[in-house]
Each structure stands twice: as structure tokens, then as C-alpha cells.
């Protein structure tokens, strides 16, 4: 699943290419992907423009005059810019036609979703989504720690909970906890304020570094047609099972936490 750096990379790519260009037509080939009435969805897009594109956690927010188009890529979603004349592939489910190109939403697993909402309902739409991991303010820390300390779950699992902090997935949770020297098995109830500060500090450092390298491509992520990320070349622990830790030279381990593969250094992160 694309995480914060990958979605930010997609956002930046789209902003460079589609803003302020009239949408001439919209084709919806898999209606279940649209959380509105399809006719309404098309009507509010055709002959309109994307004025700006924002991101919150793993969500893309396309700004129109009166509405926002919210898009979540889920597991395999991606946006590609192609010629209008290009043949439609079997995994292209929503197509936006512009004058001299088309923007195609490609999703092999069909899990992605899109919805048009009114501008005044944006906050309500995100009411159950936590602060963006790359934009956590000091005023957010007390509430975040309160939610973490109420949990009996491992901190690795908590970091994947988008209602607490949004944007972090399996890859970056491993990297953040390694850099913060926190065991992924540590219970939320035992996380201190200082440890949360470390998590927030290294979240921003690692996520921004990943954005610089256009995200991480381990399986299928591309920010545009065939453009892969490069941050997989700089990962410290994720997918590094049985390799030497670059800090202490001990062997990196892999365990399952709530069904998710978790990579860590037992020495650096104090796992016995």
C-alpha cells in the first residue's frame, strides 16, 4: 500500500501536470470505485478544473471550485498520464480526459475509492483520521499520547492505526521505530512522552527523506508511468531479515505482529 511519501510523490507529479486544465470528459469503468452516484460524479467534474491537489495521510484531495475529489489508492492504485488515443487497459477503471492527454486511475485489485464532497464537509470527512505524520504539532502530542497509552497493542500496530497518526504504513513504521530505538513489541500503555517525541521526530526525518527519493518501490509502486521510487535502497531494517544491522552489526530479525511482518534490530531496539 502506498504510504505518506508515495502519496506525496504522486501528488507532486499530478500538480506538475494537470492543474488548471479543463476536464473534457470522465469515463467510469468500475462504478463500485465511486462513492457517489456516478452521474453526479461525472457532472461535477466535466468542464471543471483541478485548482490544487492536497494530501492528508494516505489520501489525495483534488480541489475544484465548489467540491473536493477525495481519492484513496488503497493497495495498488496509481495515476498515469497517457495519450487520449492509448488503448484502455483492463486495470484502468476511471479516466479523466483533457485536451491533449488523459489521466487514468489504474488499480489491479480494485480496492481504491473516490468520492466528491462539498468543501464545507472536509473536516467531517476526516474526523476519524489522525494528524498527518509529517505535520504533527506540539499541541497534538498530548492527545496522541493519550490514545497510545490507552492501548494494550504493540506500538508497531498502533503506528499503523490511521485514526491515531495518519500516513504511516508497514515499511515506515519499521524504519521509524528502528531510528527511535524503540522495540516494536512495546505496549502502547508503556510508551513515554519522550518516546513519542522521538517517534514524531524520526517520522518527519524518514518520511521527508523518502519523499526526496520519490518513495519506496518494493513490489509495484510507481508515481507515474514506470517511474519507481528509490528509497528502498536506503532502508535500514525493512525487508533486511538476516542481514547485519548497519549500526551495531547484529542480525536483523523478522517477526509477525498482528499478522504484519515486522523487521527490527534486537540489539538497537532492546528486544530480548
What are these regions (language model features)?
Residues 3-6, 10, 19, 37, ...:
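Alpha-helical structural motif
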Residues 22-41, 46-49, 54, 59-61, ...:
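Basic, nucleic-acid-binding surfaces and adjacent catalytic neighborhoods in DNA/RNA-processing proteins
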Residues 65, 69-167, 172-179, 187:
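Phosphate/anion-contacting hairpin/loop surfaces
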Residues 1-116:
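Surface-exposed binding/hinge segments that line
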Amino acid at each position: 500500500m502506498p504510504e505518506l511519501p508515495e502519496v506525496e510523490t504522486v501528488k507532486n507529479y499530478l500538480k506538475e501536470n494537470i492543474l488548471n486544465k479543463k476536464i473534457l470528459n470522465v469515463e467510469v469503468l468500475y462504478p463500485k470505485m465511486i462513492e457517489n452516484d456516478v452521474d453526479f460524479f461525472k457532472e461535477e467534474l466535466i468542464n471543471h478544473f483541478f485548482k490544487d491537489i492536497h494530501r492528508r495521510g494516505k489520501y489525495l484531495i483534488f480541489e475544484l471550485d465548489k467540491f473536493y475529489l477525495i481519492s484513496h489508492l488503497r493497495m495498488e492504485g496509481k495515476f498515469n498520464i497517457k495519450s487520449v488515443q492509448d488503448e484502455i487497459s483492463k486495470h484502468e477503471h476511471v479516466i479523466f480526459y483533457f485536451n491533449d492527454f488523459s489521466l487514468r486511475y489504474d488499480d489491479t485489485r480494485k480496492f481504491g475509492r473516490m468520492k466528491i464532497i462539498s468543501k464545507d464537509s472536509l473536516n467531517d470527512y476526516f474526523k476519524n483520521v489522525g494528524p498527518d505524520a509529517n505535520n504533527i504539532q506540539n499541541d497534538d502530542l498530548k492527545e496522541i499520547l493519550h490514545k497510545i497509552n490507552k492501548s494494550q497493542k504493540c506500538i508497531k500496530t498502533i503506528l499503523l492505526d490511521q485514526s491515531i497518526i495518519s500516513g504511516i504504513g508497514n515499511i515506515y513504521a519499521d524504519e521509524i521505530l528502528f531510528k527511535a530505538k524503540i522495540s516494536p513489541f512495546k505496549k502502547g500503555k508503556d510508551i513515554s512522552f519522550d518516546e513519542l517525541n522521538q517517534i514524531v521526530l524520526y517520522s518527519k526525518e524518514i518520511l521527508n527523506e523518502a519523499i526526496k527519493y520519490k518513495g519506496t518501490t518494493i513490489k509495484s509502486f510507481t508515481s507515474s508511468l514506470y517511474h519507481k521510487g528509490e528509497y528502498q535502497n536506503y532502508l535500514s531494517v525493512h525487508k533486511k531479515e538476516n542481514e547485519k544491522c548497519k549500526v551495531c552489526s547484529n542480525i536483523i530479525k523478522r517477526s509477525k505482529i498482528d499478522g504484519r511482518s515486522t523487521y527490527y534490530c534486537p540489539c538497537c531496539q532492546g528486544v530480548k
